[in-house]
Amino acid sequence: LSHKASWRFLRIVKMRTITILLFFGAFLLSALKAEGDTIRYQLLWNSMTATTGNSPFWFQNNRYGTVPFDATNTNLFATIRKDKSANDKLFDYNFVASGYVGISNKQSALYLHELYLNARLWVFNASVGMREEFQGTQDETLSSGGLLFSQNARPMPKVFIGIEDFTPLFFKNKMLEVKGGMYNGWFTDQVYTQNLLFHHKFAYLRVGGIHSPIHLQYGLEHAAQWGGIVPGEYGQQPIGFTDFINVFRARGGSSAATLFEQINVGGNHIMSQSAKVELKLSKYDIKAYWQNISEDQPVDFLWNSVNVADGLWGITVQNKAFPFIQKVLYEYLNTTDQSGPFHDMDGVVYGGNDSYFNNYLYQNGWTHYGRTIGTPFITSPIYNKNKEIGILNNRVQVHHIGVEGYYHEYNYRILSSFTKNYGTYSDYPNETLRTSTNMLLEVNKHFEKIWNVDIGIQVGLDAGSMYGNNTGFALKISKKGILFHIK
């Protein structure tokens, strides 16, 4: 397709997306009147300060890009939502609309954070919009973040079709469960590449059953950046339907793509696989998981991967009888191997120096608004002092510990991470080792007699040569409740 025809195709896709959103919006209003639903609200005030020029590591990372880089900042959030129904209905839907005012030393601005509508018919889901998503096998509250997808970057507008939650297949006792689907969307930051497109699909299998104490889980993920207008000689990248099929199949680009894209694959592709084991005992729940990524080669099953030394390994132990220490987590992250230091391995085979989250064509890499979409320990460009837009530190080793629990009416969370940072293979073999210790203590309490609010305090600490020495304090006040109920 010509560039003009390709843009016509993209405009048609966007218009159809808007049409679907409007259709669901109209349906939502009729559903509210017909069935009756509870609409909830939340107001949140979050303010922090720190001893250096930026906020501590765990203050600003894995926060969906909502916390500014600056040391002193305040966010005022407002959210309206309708949650998923508790009962298993044939049809269900949920939506969220949220925004915030961000105030810092450098700027103040109004941000639209989430705006999406999700509908489910039987086991199938369809959603449109921007939403906070949790993807992967890692722990949701204590993890350092998934390897390919974490909670680090701002949501982007996407369309999803698929089976969102694990669904029994053939067996009534849930012996075999599956989930999977496909996302397509747009990067909205426009940092380097204009109108960059997003593609992501996944498939997971879980074996065990409701009567078994052991569950095994395995999943595959494929994500890609494609299309867009690249500055300089490369210019407009192809975005026709044939190009989308090539991206979907991870095949070489069309004749309109760059020569390297034609030889390799069209776009920037990252594959991931993960495995998880869950063990349920009388007093404990134990979960162990592993994640790996592949940047320029097909995924090899588990231990056959060329970069098998790289990955995220984690284990959690949940205590059912002692709430003071309710859950403990340990994770080890390694990304130093990257299939070796040389892309030209032997003059025939090419595949080393994977340089995770970087790409020669899309130089902003696997990021959105200056933050990595995957693990935050592959350092986000927002930390780059020279204002470069790419990843300057993607060879890391991390030991991460998390603990959470309750004491009377207080709940707490502790994160502690120790990292070794080696930069990228472009620094090899003269790389400079930089270390860092990053800690977070968070305590929250619900005050029913004080306007029914939740108050939380946080203390963050950074120490070392990677992110510097820094101490921060944060205060959070939130109030949530029922906005209205339609019978």
Where are these regions (language model features)?
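Transmembrane beta-strand segments of Gram-negative outer membrane beta-barrel proteins
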Residues: 35-76, 86-97, 178-184, 455
